[in-house]
Amino acid sequence: PEVPSAMPFPTDDQRDRPWLMRTYAGHSSAKSSNELYRRNLAKGQTGLSVAFDLPTQTGYDPDHELSRGEVGKVGVSIAHLGDMRSLFDQIPLAQMNTSMTINATAPWLLALYLGVAEEQGAPLDALQGTTQNDLIKEHLSRGTSLLPPKPSLRPTKAVILFTTQAVPHWTPTDDSPSHP
């Protein structure tokens, strides 16, 4: 690869790469969201930004009584590996940059994503993306935490340690300063 001349200037290869364009989207079912993602990619979108529904964000099964009326309302419902497979069907994850705006259930959803990538034959070092993984925000802003503050740091740290070692092009946490 070409070496930049000075400072942190990009190489020609980096400079010619198109901007990352991701629409925050996800609704109803994994199948419906997949159709939307593939339409957007066909129109020139260069990455994906997954919006999850409230039961998925808070770790509730879609069949749980507290999930009633919320499944698929503000994002896609993902309850298991089969849902994640449907969400990314015919989307080559090794060629995608995927953002998952998810906090409390970030470790679990990242594991499902990596499972689908593995099934597709994508090497971990080819995957690019971001998990918000900001569990402190869940305590301070939303009240959707699964664990008390101190124990919440353990899964956050686990995602950071794992991705920095095994998935080098993944941004393991994206702190959300825009929340009060």
Language-model-derived ranges and their functions:
Residues 1-180:
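Catalytic alpha/beta active-site cores
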